[in-house]
């Protein structure tokens, strides 16, 4: 059994991670940490785990954590995974970070967007961007995996076939994305108060969202040249889910059916990416509770643009599920281990 620790186990992503790992046949949940609920059983904080997860939550003790665990997941705000990563490297253990500390390769960009000093810069070259559909082979050998952000996951998977096949003008990419409130985290804030979100729909982080440089970095690698995007996220009155609507100008004439075939070829054999038939569009309900990313492409002949729709569950494929998928890749296990389920409906 692989001894696993989860740091930040009582955030939304952390709790989903614990739930998924509890059903993993090769994992022993060895240590769960929580700054807020240390000393309490996990099931007392999350009653849906009663009789399933018996661990008592602990305060973070990095030497103890690294000594007792083979693989560590960090589900923490940015800036907090760096000291853990340094100890992981010293002790030859493995880390999957659900935060932003190791996603951006340019430390100056990280510090500009996150307003935080990067104290583990030497480890950036050791970190692998954890999108298995694109980086599976290098994830297998990695020590530090930077689990992608939720918005970037939906956007990058949505655009990858177009950029690798050089089918769109990379200067015209517009991303209009909507997320459920759980994407804002479990901490209290006025913005996510029930009275503020119910029956409301609002943009936020307009032209300033921190996922922007992550999206641009990965799209540029796919395109082979710098990419700049216009990215506007929105907060919707639902609990979970992301729907990204992406617009790009086509370079050559192509039909919806031809593009759909190109996408299916690109994602052939991928367990968690579902390319929908022409005329069928993704919904957040269609992926809720699953590790799937549903994608459709439509050619607007009149404007010579392609419209890509990409839907994920922000807490699963956008966070915890993708982290477990990365664990499976690292261990050489089937990628759907502990993830082999459809979503919940209705």
Curated annotation (Swiss-Prot):
Gene3D superfamilies: Dihydrodipicolinate Reductase, domain 2, NAD(P)-binding Rossmann-like Domain. It catalyses: N-acetyl-L-glutamate 5-semialdehyde + phosphate + NADP(+) = N-acetyl-L-glutamyl 5-phosphate + NADPH + H(+). Pfam families: Semialdhyde_dh, Semialdhyde_dhC_1. It is an enzyme of class 1 (oxidoreductase). Pathway: Amino-acid biosynthesis; L-arginine biosynthesis; N(2)-acetyl-L-ornithine from L-glutamate: step 3/4. The active site is at residue 150. InterPro entries: AGPR_AS, AGPR_type-1, NAD(P)-bd_dom_sf, NAGSA_dehydrogenase, Semialdehyde_DH_NAD-bd. Keywords: Amino-acid biosynthesis, Arginine biosynthesis, Cytoplasm, NADP, Oxidoreductase. Coiled coil: none annotated. One of its GO terms (cellular component) is cytoplasm. It is found in: Cytoplasm. Its EC number is 1.2.1.38. PROSITE patterns: ARGC. One of its GO terms (molecular function) is NADP+ binding. Belongs to the NAGSA dehydrogenase family. Type 1 subfamily. Catalyzes the NADPH-dependent reduction of N-acetyl-5-glutamyl phosphate to yield N-acetyl-L-glutamate 5-semialdehyde. This is N-acetyl-gamma-glutamyl-phosphate reductase. It comes from Desulforamulus reducens (strain ATCC BAA-1160 / DSM 100696 / MI-1) (Desulfotomaculum reducens).
């Amino acid at each position: 059994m692989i001894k696993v620790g989860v740091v930040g186990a009582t955030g939304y992503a952390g709790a989903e991670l614990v739930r998924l790992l509890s059903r993993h046949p090769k994992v022993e949940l060895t240590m769960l940490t929580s700054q807020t609920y240390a000393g309490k059983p996990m099931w007392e904080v999350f009653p849906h785990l009663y009789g399933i997860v018996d661990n008592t939550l602990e305060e973070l003790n990095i030497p103890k954590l690294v000594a007792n665990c083979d693989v560590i997941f960090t589900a923490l705000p940015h800036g907090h995974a760096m000291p853990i990563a340094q100890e992981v490297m010293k002790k030859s253990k493995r880390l999957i970070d659900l935060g932003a500390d190791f996603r951006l390769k340019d430390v100056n960009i990280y510090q500009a967007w996150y307003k935080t000093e990067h104290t583990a810069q030497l480890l950036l070259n050791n970190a692998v961007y954890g999108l298995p559909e694109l980086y599976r082979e290098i994830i297998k050998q990695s020590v530090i995996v930077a689990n992608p952000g939720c918005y970037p996951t939906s956007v990058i998977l949505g655009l990858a076939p177009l950029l690798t096949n050089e089918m769109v003008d990379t200067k015209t990419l517009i991303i209009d994305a909507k997320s459920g409130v759980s994407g804002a985290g479990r901490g209290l804030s006025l913005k996510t108060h029930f009275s503020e979100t119910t029956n409301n729909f609002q943009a936020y982080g307009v032209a300033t969202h921190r996922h922007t440089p992550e999206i641009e970095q990965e799209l540029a690698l796919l395109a082979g040249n710098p990419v700049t995007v216009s990215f506007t996220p929105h907060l919707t009155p639902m609990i979970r889910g992301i729907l990204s609507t992406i617009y790009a100008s086509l370079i050559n004439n192509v039909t919806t059916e031809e593009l759909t075939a190109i996408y299916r070829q690109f994602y052939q054999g991928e367990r968690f990416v579902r390319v929908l038939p022409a005329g069928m569009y993704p919904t957040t309900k269609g992926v809720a509770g699953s590790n799937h990313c549903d994608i459709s492409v439509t050619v607007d002949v009149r404007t010579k643009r392609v419209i890509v729709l990409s839907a994920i569950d922000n807490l699963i494929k956008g966070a915890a599920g993708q982290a477990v998928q990365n664990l499976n890749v690292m261990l050489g296990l089937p990628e759907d281990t502990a993830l082999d389920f459809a979503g919940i409906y209705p």
